[in-house]
Regions:
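Helix-adjacent hinge/juxtasegments
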Residues: 85-122
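Short, contiguous alpha-helical
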Residues: 1-7, 16, 20-40, 44-92, ...
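A general structural signal marking secondary-structure boundaries and capping sites
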Residues: 37, 41, 117-124
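Acidic catalytic patch
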Residues: 119-136
Length: 183
């Protein structure tokens, strides 16, 4: 056979929440990349090795390792503010002088993100819609769409960061969730 299937025993506990798994992987992999980036000099952290690189128009340019990793953290802040109805967060909080400072901030933002999504999920409210007044023209987004958006663009940015770190001579691994689950 080319593969074997092993059934899991029936469980009275609900099956593993794939969204929660992806959020944990996102936070863990981002922490790993920040740990790798801590080996960069301050010049390498801010070096514009991809001038003009823009992931999302509203997010601005992300030409350096620091800018890309900062955008991963900042985007969670933006969406947390949207969900809570808070003011648009200043980008300065994620434009840290180094990876160590950003990593510490990431821990706090990550906890808030994990808790927020978990609470809405447990309450069965991921289908709720948020009218985002932070957008230039207010838009509406279902919460599950916000989570999908954050995870999608975070994954994209993590791969950009991996490539950029490699250009600085740092191997950050593949970021494969299967490898992460084994560690």
């Amino acid at each position: 056979p080319q593969a074997l299937w092993i059934d899991s025993p029936p469980s009275p506990v609900s099956q593993l929440d794939v969204t929660a798994l992806m959020i944990e992987h996102d936070l863990g992999d981002t922490a790993h990349l920040l740990e790798c980036a801590a080996r960069l000099s301050s010049q390498q952290w801010t070096a514009p090795i991809r001038p003009g690189q823009t992931v999302l128009d509203w997010g601005g340019a992300e030409p350096s390792v620091g800018a890309v990793l900062g955008a991963i953290v900042w985007s969670k802040q933006v969406w947390l503010a949207t969900i809570a109805g808070d003011d648009f967060p200043a980008r300065a909080s994620t434009q840290s002088a180094d990876a160590v400072a950003l990593a510490a901030f990431h821990v706090d933002v990550g906890k808030h993100w994990r808790t927020t999504v978990s609470e809405y999920s447990a309450a069965g409210r991921l289908g709720d819609t948020v009218i985002d007044a932070l957008c230039e023209t207010p838009e509406s987004f279902p919460l599950y769409g916000i989570v999908a958006h954050v995870l999608t663009y975070s994954a994209h940015r993590r791969e950009l960061a991996r490539t950029m770190l490699a250009e600085h001579g740092i191997d950050a691994g593949l970021g494969d969730p299967l490898d992460w689950m084994r560690s």
